């Protein structure tokens, strides 16, 4: 997807600040769940499998949402490498910030929960890529505006956590730290760290 942005209005990865809310659009982990299940177009798929495969084969980039977010969000990224990896890119670009994420706040895919179980669906939501939903940050005083945008657009926009000082992403589940096995896709050319 390509296009033009008015001068000075590009929404970039940098710009998040400590104390801001972290949001995601839609549900996460469906494309990764389709891969885990080995779904492809040659199979006769159930309704739930079809939902997952559609998200893998025909993702819908949130271009219109991104345009509107230029006036609300301070930083944004599409979730192509996995939530933890892509949020990490935003935090690094914004000055080595951190994040506190609540696992229970993540809108999990009902189809992935049903076919893989809730823990696997959570793992895919945190680390699976190719969803092309948006992850963005916004100051707490813009919560009402984000909620209004969600209602008017018909999209699910969920606050999943907060930007914190210091590096790293902490995910808590039931008040205790949740350990993710991996952080998401790492491009072969990326440096460690």
Segments from the language model and where they lie:
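Short, glycine/charged-enriched secondary-structure capping and boundary segments
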Residues: 13-14, 37-39, 90-91, 150-151
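Short, compositionally biased
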Residues: 32-50
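Glycine-/charge-enriched secondary-structure boundary and capping motifs
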Residues: 1-5, 71-72, 76-193
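Glycine-rich anion-binding loops of enzyme active sites
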Residues: 1-36, 162
